[in-house]
A protein has these predicted regions:
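N-terminal beta1-alpha1-beta2 submodule of the flavodoxin-like/Rossmannoid cofactor-binding fold
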Residues: 1-76, 83-85, 90, 94, ...
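Redox-cofactor binding/interface segments in oxidoreductases and associated redox assembly factors
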Residues: 76-77, 105
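Short, glycine-/small-residue-rich phosphate/pyrophosphate-handling segment
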Residues: 104-144
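Solvent-exposed loop/turn segments at secondary-structure junctions
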Residues: 11, 36, 81-83, 110-113, ...
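Alpha-helix boundary/capping detector
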Residues: 40, 47, 55, 101, ...
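Short, conserved loop/helix-junction motifs that constitute active-site signature segments
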Residues: 68, 94-101, 124-127
Length: 160
């Protein structure tokens, strides 16, 4: 069964976890990249990203580095913006026919809570079985991330 971890990362939190998870389950890594990148100024990133997420906007993403049709199983990684998935991930889900391939999701937020985001995703992802909420590295809750990622990897391995 061919597996891939598909993720978007603005600050590097999601990217670091994606690499660890892909390594742990023996999956390829596919990073989502915007055609027009976000501004480098943090306040502008927050304003634009939050607005895009709140209004369900779908910014253009670059072509993927690998052919997504070749994969049987996908693990999705996203930061949480305005209580939902990051806009580039929204673009990915709408552009590619992969909803039935996604079995696991990992999310990042300041508070480490993803319940609202996962509730929305569960309605769109019929095979979603495993999820984990991780805290951004600046958060006090980030000390639990390593254990959570390890447990997430074990759960995903049991599925695939």
């Amino acid at each position: 069964m061919k597996k891939a971890v598909v993720f978007y990362s603005l600050s590097g939190n999601t990217q670091a976890a994606a690499k660890e998870i892909a390594e742990g389950i023996g999956a390829d890594l596919i990073e989502l990249k915007l055609v027009k990148p976000f501004p480098t100024e943090k306040s502008k990133q927050l304003a634009l990203g939050g607005m895009q997420a709140m209004f369900g906007m779908k910014p253009a993403i670059q072509e993927l580095s690998k052919n997504i049709k070749e994969y049987d199983v996908l693990i999705l990684g996203t930061p949480i913006w305005a209580g939902t998935i990051a806009a580039p991930v929204h673009s990915f889900l709408n552009k590619y026919q992969v909803l039935d391939k996604i079995v696991a999701v990992f999310t990042f937020s300041d508070g480490g809570d993803n319940k609202r985001c996962i509730a929305k995703l569960s309605k769109r992802l019929p095979r979603l079985k495993v999820e984990v909420a991780l805290a951004n590295r600046d958060s006090d809750l980030a000390i639990h991330n390593a254990d959570k990622i390890h447990h997430f990897i074990k759960e995903v391995k049991r599925l695939v």
